[in-house]
Amino acid sequence: MPDAKELLHSNLHEVFSERDPERRRAASERTYTEDVRFIDPEGEFVGRQAVRDQAQKLLDGVLAGFVFEEDGPPYVGTDTAALAWRFGPPGNPVARGIDILTIRDGRVSVVRTLVSAPETDV
């Protein structure tokens, strides 16, 4: 059974960063419960396929060189874990956020993604 740090890694790198649909599918089977809920600023999506679809939509909308990079250490509780990330060309992110996972029976049952607000001049 994977631990919280492994689930954080898998969610970010093996699902949301993975451009190969078959490898993403295999990772999602290992990482998420069947009824996983993914909640981000665009809405709430339920089920492994819905998570895979959101990952594909994200990757389809950016340049091939964009990557997710961890942006700090993982934070781990008894049934929750969190990881900050940055996204964009390596070393030059265009977005930052944090994934907060709820873990049930060794798999992720909820992914809450918070995205930093765009910086604006005041």
Where do the protein language model's features map onto the residues?
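A beta-strand edge to alpha-helix "cap/lid" segment located at domain peripheries
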Residues: 3, 59-122
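Short acidic-aromatic low-complexity motifs
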Residues: 1-31
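Residue-level detector of alpha-helix boundaries and kinks
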Residues: 12-13, 36, 40, 86
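Domain-scale activation on soluble regions of proteins
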Residues: 2-5, 45, 52, 108
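A solvent-exposed, acidic/Ser-Thr-rich amphipathic alpha-helical stretch
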Residues: 25-77
